[in-house]
Swiss-Prot record:
Source organism per UniProt: Eulemur macaco macaco
Compositionally biased intervals (Basic and acidic residues): 155-164
MF annotations from Gene Ontology: zinc ion binding
Record domain PET: where: 92-199
Alphabetized CDD domains for the sequence: LIM1_Testin (cd09413), LIM2_Testin (cd09416), LIM3_Testin (cd09419), PET_testin (cd09829)
Name this polypeptide is given: Testin
One GO cellular component term noted in the UniProt record for this chain: focal adhesion
Function: Scaffold protein that may play a role in cell adhesion, cell spreading and in the reorganization of the actin cytoskeleton. Plays a role in the regulation of cell proliferation. May act as a tumor suppressor.
Gene that encodes the chain: TES
GO biological process, one term: negative regulation of cell population proliferation
Length: 421
């Protein structure tokens, strides 16, 4: 790819969703404008997933690329135009006749994603067992939740070097090896079945990596256990509660078919969010979403949100940073060797802090420098000086003294308070 093509591709990436309104900030945001290397809006600092951007094709490409070169190729299709794998997500449309006085109208419900099972009744049961606000019905809160989790749990920059900011050839190679490794060892997609349907596999069957979804190997004797399974009590691997007869369960092949989950319990062990489209990563007997699995394997830059493949990076405030990305969150100036203040877990340089975030002294009405001592009571602050922290009536210095606060004013005595009331 030549330089002109690369620059054009980068420009198109930054034009995507340009001007889209923020669902969180509403009118406070002028519209989405992607930061050059942070994965946020330059105007409101919210993520792309917080904006009303139509990303269905992009998300389908991202998940399609995730499943490429895995056992889940049945879930993707390659476009003839560019050969890019697209995720064939299962969309479910339910039609319910609604009786009216004269006619019978049809109520149609479209799920933007549903488990890819042949039994639609089972898929419908699965959906009903999810919290209402997490059911991906088109145009609903649940559909917005799914869209947000696709962006959070499966960031494109965790699998595609071209989505990252200025990786070296060595870092690109390391990332490609890392992605190949997690595809082979951890990535999986849950299966929805009735617990009794798995009895045919036998209790001594095991998963073989690299096989197709139906591959299993018999170990030991294969005697008939049907009578034993008839009275088996199944319990959820997450909540330990029993499974009701006839309710669908989720199985994770990498975990083994001796484990099963309620639909609402198939969650990441770190963020506890539903695993979007039942895509999971299995490690140390735990389920992870893509983001938190990668976090357990590699440090993540708190500035650009990308995994760090360089040997040189910095640690500050219990977070990891690319050396070039330890910058002021407001002005992007590099902070190495500079004074900074953490604001909502983001580092801000001293000038930006004083300009944008510093509290104002109730005495002199100037911003309080972060390195200067101050007195704070409720939402009010003062410079801890003889010029500012004074009785609002007689101007007596109150440092180290008892005082009476009244709506931003402070008094040294009841008498002074009465004189000002």
């Amino acid at each position: 790819m030549d330089l002109e093509t690369k620059v054009k591709k980068m420009g198109l990436g930054h034009e995507q969703g340009f001007g889209a309104p923020c669902l969180k900030c509403k009118e406070k945001c002028e519209g989405f404008e992607l930061h050059f290397w942070r994965k946020i809006c330059r105007n409101c600092k919210c993520g792309q997933e917080e904006h009303d951007i139509l990303l269905s094709n992009e998300e389908d490409r991202k998940v399609g690329k995730l499943f490429e070169d895995t056992k889940y190729t049945t879930l993707i299709a390659k476009l003839k135009s560019d050969g890019i794998p697209m995720y064939k997500r299962n969309v479910m449309i339910l039609t319910n006749p609604v009786a009216a006085r004269k006619n019978v109208s049809i109520n149609t419900v479209t799920y933007e994603w549903a488990p890819p099972v042949q039994n639609q009744a089972l898929a419908r049961q699965y959906m009903q067992m999810l919290p209402k606000d997490k059911q991906p019905v088109a145009g609903s809160e649940g559909a917005q939740y799914r869209k947000k989790q696709l962006a959070k749990q499966l960031p494109a920059h965790d699998q595609d070097p071209s989505k990252c900011h200025e990786l070296s050839p060595k870092e690109v190679k390391e990332m490609e090896q890392f992605v190949k490794k997690y595809k082979n060892e951890a990535l999986g997609v849950g299966d929805v079945k009735l617990p009794c349907e798995l009895d045919a596999r036998g209790p001594n069957q095991m998963y073989i990596p690299g096989g197709d979804r139906s591959t299993s190997a018999a170990v030991g004797a294969m005697e008939d256990k049907s009578a034993e399974h008839k009275n088996t009590q199944y319990s959820c691997y997450c909540c330990k509660m029993s499974m009701k007869e006839g309710d669908p369960a989720i199985y994770a092949e990498r975990a083994g078919y001796d484990k099963l989950w309620h639909p609402a319990c198939f969650v990441c062990s770190i963020c506890y969010e539903l695993l979007v489209d039942m895509i999971y990563f299995w490690k140390d007997e735990k389920l992870y979403c893509g983001r938190h699995y990668c976090d357990s394997e590699k440090p993540r830059c708190a500035g650009c949100d990308e995994l760090i493949f360089s040997n040189e990076y910095t640690q500050a405030e219990n977070q990891n940073w690319h050396l070039k990305h330890f910058c002021c969150f407001d002005c992007d100036n590099i902070l190495a060797g500079e004074i900074y203040v953490m604001v909502n877990d983001k580092p801000v340089c001293k000038p930006c802090y004083v300009k944008n975030h510093a509290v104002v002294c109730q005495g002199c009405h100037n911003a309080i420098d972060p390195e200067v001592q101050r007195v704070t009571y409720n939402n009010f602050s003062w410079h801890a000086s003889t010029e500012c922290f004074l009785c609002s009536c007689c101007s007596k210095c109150l440092i180290g003294q008892k005082f009476m606060p009244v709506e931003g004013m402070v008094f040294c005595s009841v008498e002074c308070k009465k004189m000002m009331s």
